[in-house]
Amino acid sequence: MTPSIDALRDFRASTCNLVGTPTVTNDLSENIILTSLDDLHNWARLSSLWPLLYGTACCFIEFAALIGSRFDFDRFGLVPRSSPRQADLIIVAGTVTMKMAPALVRLYEQMPEPKYVIAMGACTITGGMFSSDSTTAVRGVDKLIPVDLYLPGCPPRPEAIFDAVIKLRKKVGNEALRERGKLLPTHRYFTVAHKMKQVKPIITGTYLRAKTQQNALQAGVALPVDFKAEALPTKVILSNSLSLDN
């Protein structure tokens, strides 16, 4: 009678004395994680980004919607801070003017390293619709501080802000401690210690007295102007409800 396969398997297991996986190894693999110092440091930072909210226009309203329960941005570890010395991320949302530029630069310089910047909205990235007519709007916040991530839109939706935060977390996770000194900006367009050179006002009207404009002005003066106009009938209403017609 030929034994069954199950019987052979049981006989082999009882006589061969197979060496199994040690229980100590299983316990260690479930309680110890092997990683590098860079990965551990980056994991701790990307899971606890503390943003400093710098909102000057309508883009900040969209970011304020993230605080509500519908989007719940706390799940990303974002804890808004009111002090730049406790923040490692600044989100610039809205138009930046020349008068607000020193305040923005001072806030950035007060943040500890490593620090990151998200430019949110078209007005922050390029100046937006205000840059065409306004002479005081900064045409790009990257002229003041280095930007790590650009978030276009007018304004961006809250879902786009989440996507920007996720991309920034990926960037933080790929950094190395040895390369941190090489990633610092080497040139700054504007700093707090920078002294602006005062110049004369641009709009003074002196260009009309230039020689290149004299021919056009003389041609305009020679044009006849008709000041004669027929008198239009007027009607005067008095306080005693009487009217006089001319």
Curated annotation (Swiss-Prot):
Keywords: 4Fe-4S, Iron, Iron-sulfur, Membrane, Metal-binding, NAD, Organellar chromatophore, Plastid, Quinone, Thylakoid, Translocase, Transport, Ubiquinone. GO terms for cellular component: organellar chromatophore thylakoid membrane; plasma membrane; plastid; respiratory chain complex I. It is found in: Plastid, Organellar chromatophore thylakoid membrane. It comes from the Eukaryota. The keyword rRNA processing does not apply. Its EC number is 7.1.1.-. NDH-1 shuttles electrons from NADH, via FMN and iron-sulfur (Fe-S) centers, to quinones in the respiratory chain. Couples the redox reaction to proton translocation (for every two electrons transferred, four hydrogen ions are translocated across the cytoplasmic membrane), and thus conserves the redox energy in a proton gradient. NDH-1 is composed of 14 different subunits. Subunits nuoB, C, D, E, F, and G constitute the peripheral sector of the complex. This is NAD(P)H-quinone oxidoreductase subunit K, organellar chromatophore. The gene is ndhK.
